[in-house]
């Protein structure tokens, strides 16, 4: 896979859906990515981050995105903050993507980092450590009612996702492979980027039209200007 994507991107994100830190060959994957000089980004619930700390520190990780809303208690979050303090060579994005009252979590962050947190969507907590806030969104589901026919997205334009079986899809929210563009094990990226299916989806986004039935049922579309 690394051989096929080189020349097309300098960044890889080790997630579509699921927890990347539990992969049994995480260390091997990171070393392969590092050998291709790729910037690795990981999104994690961080529940086993302490156990995987040596792997994280001993490999080049550009950014760790940590979902703070996945924890059950403030004590768990506080423990993770001390683990994060040991990671000095990576950007850390602490995410609060929910519609709840996060005042207790914010107070904990203020104490730990000795900061008065503002209402900015992105707030700098420390060296390379950021708090990122946004509202909860609904994942795409082909079985729900249509949300909108109009909107745009970065899927396909700025990113492609590769599923475990090699299926290529426009974005990381399509974990079931509904918008299948091809397979990385069976074809090269150039042919995928020239395919009619890919061009239809991207041209639709460029014209504020949602071509895919799955995209019409995706709540994330509301985050982009033009989405309804």
Features from the language model and the residues they span:
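Conserved glycine-rich "GG(E/T)P / GGGxP" loop and the immediately following alpha-helix
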Residues: 1-125
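Active-site-flanking alpha-helical
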Residues: 26, 171-172
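Short, positively charged
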Residues: 128-148, 196-197
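Short, small/polar residue-rich loop motifs at catalytic or cofactor-binding pockets
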Residues: 153-156
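Short hydrophobic/aromatic beta-strand element in the GNAT-like acyltransferase core
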Residues: 159
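Short, acidic, Ser/Thr-enriched surface-loop or helix-capping motifs
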Residues: 162-163
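Flexible mid-to-C-terminal extensions adjoining Fe-S/redox cofactors in radical SAM and related proteins
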Residues: 173-228
